[in-house]
Amino acid sequence: MATADEHLGYPYRASGEARTRARPETVWRVVSSIGGENRYFTLNALWTVREAMDALIGGEGLVRRRPEGGTLRPGDRIDSWTVLVADAPRRLALLFGMKAPGRGVLEFVIAREGDTTVVSATAYWRPKGLAGVLYWRAMEPAHLFLFRMLTREICRRAERLEAEWAAARVRAAQPASGPGPRLSLAARRLP
């Protein structure tokens, strides 16, 4: 098993980031729900192709799983990934579990900057030989595109979640019988 921060020294990385007005705790809720039946939020066809390739060579790429309960812990398995770091609401690092010529980690970092929250997704890669370097070079453009799309979608989902919560609070604050009829001044009877 890799150590929690070992990947920070890996020589190759690709990342994307996005900003949202959603709170870090809400962004974490979205990020930490990744995998399993939830899939990967965007461009799932690309993830599925890579998973199928892994399955063809005997890997666990097509396995769908998430830990029971809502709290992630180091060692938990999410599909073929292993949780290295689960530091709510700031950081989630996942060890790449598919067959590949090297070792990889996907890390999400959530940080508050002023009145916005920044979420980044970064792939770290330590190649094993020339095959690992070539693998990275082939995958890097897709990673750059994918992580920009992924972080934007995470932000969109977090904003939608907060909007749904706000709407539920408004509904809960209304009287049980609902608001009465609203009449314009012209429709009211004047004495």
Q: What are these model-predicted stretches?
A:
Residues 21-25, 85-89, 109-118:
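A short, structured loop/turn motif at beta-sheet edges
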Residues 24-25, 32-99, 153, 165-168:
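Glycine-rich portal/gate segments that line the openings of hydrophobic small-molecule binding cavities
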